[in-house]
Amino acid sequence: LRKDSIMLKKKQAYTVAILGATGAVGKESLEILEERNFPIETLRLFSSKRSAGDVLSCQGKECKVEELTEASSFAGVDIAFVSATDTISRDYGARLGAAGVVVIDDSAIFRMDPDVPLVVPEVNAAALRSMKRGIVAIPNCTTTPLVMALKPLRDIAGIKRVVVTTFQSVSGTGSAAMDELVDQTKALMAFQDVKVQVYPYQIAFNLLPQVGSFGDGGDCSEEVKIVQETRKILEMPSLRVTATTVRVPVLRCHSEAINVELERPLKANDARAALAMGLGSDVVPADKLLESANGVIRAERASGQYLKDRER
């Protein structure tokens, strides 16, 4: 490890904090910590004033949500998941990292910082060896599966160019967007007018060819993120990447169509074999796609819990 790297000390159990605990990503983090039986000694949950006082459960224990303020103390915290707004990440991420806390940040604030590793463990786990600021940045939700698919191909045949089109569910915008899709769908099925609040236009039964805001160059912010983050994670700063992003009327589960131009010839069977060996990847034959449990993420798997919660 580098001498200037900040790393987590090995312990039997850790004090874990989640900033933005009542949001969609925060709740998902809680579920994953529970599923993986992560060794938690103390769990501290933070949110805005609106959600402070709520009680959430993890690993069979209930935890009261604290209001996140400038006076909040993080003494004794080992790991902090920051899954709130960019402002929260900017204000608290650096502060926690400087205090020796290992910060796992979900925002775009630190992703392109040269002193902050942008990590997909299946692709570039070695980047964790250099954590000068004590912060690990999580890539954009569409960048992660893209680089996981590209790495095996790059390793055996090199990559010249990537063209990717994403089809992104409303969960990427947050809980309010998921609620709006359900409410708009119900209204349209009942021949009623829809309310448009989260997106510029109606999302139910529609496609929006824009994820994020448009810049001067004509690309939207999501497309810029994909290009920049892919280059950083793969350590290919000159890689030619073209991205088009589309918001689709689906609660959860993104999809991507990826076209890759390789540097060296590669047989289709060899490409399939390389992808199948990639960590976190499944290769499903085209004629088996609809038959395989892993081939298609079915609606009840991707959105079932959200819909159950809506019914309560």
Per-segment meaning from a language model:
Residues 204-252, 257:
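Oxyanion-binding "anion nests"
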Residues 3-203, 239-240, 264, 268-269, ...:
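N-terminal Rossmann-like NAD(P) cofactor-binding subdomain of oxidoreductases
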Residues 2-3, 293:
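Generic short amphipathic/hydrophobic targeting helices enriched at N-termini
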Residues 239-312:
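C-terminal active-site/capping subdomain that shapes the small-molecule cofactor and substrate pocket
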Residues 48, 167, 208-212, 244-246, ...:
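Histidine- and/or cysteine-centered catalytic micro-motif in compact active-site loops
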Residues 40-45, 101, 204, 214-223, ...:
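A broad, low-specificity signal for short, low-complexity segments enriched in glycine/proline
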